Amino acid sequence: MANVVAEGAYPYCRLTDQPLSVDEVLAAVSGPEQGGIVIFVGNVRDHNAGHDVTRLFYEAYPPMVIRTLMSIIGRCEDKAEGVRVAVAHRTGELQIGDAAVVIGASAPHRAEAFDAARMCIELLKQEVPIWKKEFSSTGAEWVGDRP
């Protein structure tokens, strides 16, 4: 089992410094009533804003991350009947190709599952206190706002 930095109860919500499990996220949103399941995996890419990226470092404030993610999950699930959402996010150092976030969304019908997955990642990017330091061949810098 991964070293869990923090996690919420149901719904599945995890912050960890270990590789993420797509299978765990999938299992958390699966069920006989779920006709559509969407899995989003956000990977570390080798470029950003016109320059190379060699690795990333994610820093977080775990209690606030979990509280905020649980709120986001609740809002996404409230958008349509039967929607389930699960989220796992990495912290620490990640290499190119590593999964930084895995989001699962399911619903009785595919449209609601896609909508919930998109809503979840957009709200996560806007609201969750996780900070990203980007390393390149020319140095390193924090991306976005950081307290």
Curated annotation (Swiss-Prot):
Ligand binding (substrate): N43, V44, R45, H109, R110, K125, K132, K133, E134
CDD domains: MoaE
GO cellular component, one term: cytosol
Pathway(s) served: Cofactor biosynthesis; molybdopterin biosynthesis
UniProt catalytic activity: 2 [molybdopterin-synthase sulfur-carrier protein]-C-terminal-Gly-aminoethanethioate + cyclic pyranopterin phosphate + H2O = molybdopterin + 2 [molybdopterin-synthase sulfur-carrier protein]-C-terminal Gly-Gly + 2 H(+)
Entry keywords, A to Z: Molybdenum cofactor biosynthesis, Transferase
Quaternary structure, from the entry: Heterotetramer of 2 MoaD subunits and 2 MoaE subunits. Also stable as homodimer. The enzyme changes between these two forms during catalysis.
Protein name: Molybdopterin synthase catalytic subunit 1
